[in-house]
Amino acid sequence: MADEEKLPPGWEKRMSRPSGRGYYFNHITNPSQWERPSGNSSSGGKIWQGEPARVRRSHLLVKPVKAALDLAAGNHPDQGGGPGADQRLHPEDQGRREGL
């Protein structure tokens, strides 16, 4: 079976969280693809389109980025907000907070 054969250098098999499908990722050059890479090309097949873009986004580290932005804006997690915290609310959320 092809999955049991050794992958080319730099490639590893991963599982898509949303779909549960296996995909291949090259941690040296960073392409991701559904098809198993062959040993004779750097990309090894078709690069993701459509649904796989969601897979890539699902691996973003959203919480650390948000925490860094909050700290840069003067909001410290243990202080419950900082200067202008209400100004960054979505307009609908800000209206709810003001009782509108």
Curated annotation (Swiss-Prot):
Q: Which cysteines are joined by disulfide bonds?
A: none
Look up the domain of life of the source.
Eukaryota
Describe the location of the WW domain by residue ranges.
5-38
**InterPro entries given for it?**
WW_dom, WW_dom_sf
Spans of biased composition, class Basic and acidic residues? 1-15, 87-100
Q: Which PROSITE patterns match?
A: WW_DOMAIN_1, WW_DOMAIN_2
Q: Where is this region: Disordered?
A: 1-52, 69-100
- Ranges of compositional bias, category Polar residues: 27-44
The protein in question is named Putative PIN1-like protein
Source organism of the structure? Homo sapiens
